[in-house]
């Protein structure tokens, strides 16, 4: 529900009026995970739903089964700065896990250089290439990382897409 837009919320209201007493509407969403604002999504629809429909029973799924407490503590600390969130506190029984690190790069080249050096250091200390992974938000970010990996003989695979220089739009230009 966190990624619905204003029109979709109006449709819901047209189908089931907030004045209805049938309690026949159920909504699932996570106000901390709205990522489609660039497509018109309005996370405020969740709070509006709670207010407009006078929700009396709100179930918060706060236990996380995949992440460690170090990761969840960091996530809780970051998202706590959002004054418009509905509020929850994520927790786990998975243990503390490894400490997390944060690196602030000045630009994409510095980020790729640092990432490359970290992976080379891991590999030199015995970590197999297959145990290293890089996650990025969109495919355009892979270009500079691929350049650094290639220049440093780091083998890599792209899952869910093509290598930057194998993409048709890049081939047409070069």
Model-derived features with residue positions:
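Conserved helicase NTPase motor core
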Residues: 1-48, 63-67
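Short, glycine/charged-enriched secondary-structure capping and boundary segments
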Residues: 10-13, 40-44, 74-75, 147-151, ...
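A cross-family signal for key residues in well-ordered alpha-helices
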Residues: 13, 47-50, 117, 174
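Active-site catalytic pocket residues across diverse enzymes, especially alpha/beta-hydrolases
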Residues: 15-19, 53, 149
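Generic alpha-helical secondary structure signal
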Residues: 27, 41-48, 70, 114, ...
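Short alpha-helix plus adjacent loop in nuclease-associated cores
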Residues: 32-37, 66-67, 158-174
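Helicase P-loop NTPase motor core
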Residues: 54-57, 62-155, 168
């Amino acid at each position: 529900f966190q990624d619905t837009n204003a029109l979709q919320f109006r449709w819901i209201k047209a189908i089931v009026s907030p004045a209805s007493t049938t309690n026949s509407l159920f909504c699932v969403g996570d106000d901390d995970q709205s990522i489609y604002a660039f497509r018109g999504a309005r996370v405020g629809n969740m709070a509006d739903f709670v207010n407009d429909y006078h929700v009396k029973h709100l179930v918060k799924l706060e236990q996380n089964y995949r992440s460690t407490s170090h990761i969840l503590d960091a996530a809780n600390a970051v998202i706590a700065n959002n004054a418009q969130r509905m509020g929850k506190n994520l927790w786990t029984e998975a243990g503390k896990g490894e400490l997390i690190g944060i690196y602030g790069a000045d630009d994409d080249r510095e980020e790729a250089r640092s990432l490359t050096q970290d992976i080379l250091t891991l590999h030199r200390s015995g970590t197999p290439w297959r145990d290293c992974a890089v996650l990025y938000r969109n495919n355009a970010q892979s270009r500079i990382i691929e350049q650094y990996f290639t220049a440093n003989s780091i083998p890599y695979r792209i899952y869910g897409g093509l290598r930057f220089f194998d993409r048709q739009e890049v081939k047409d230009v070069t």
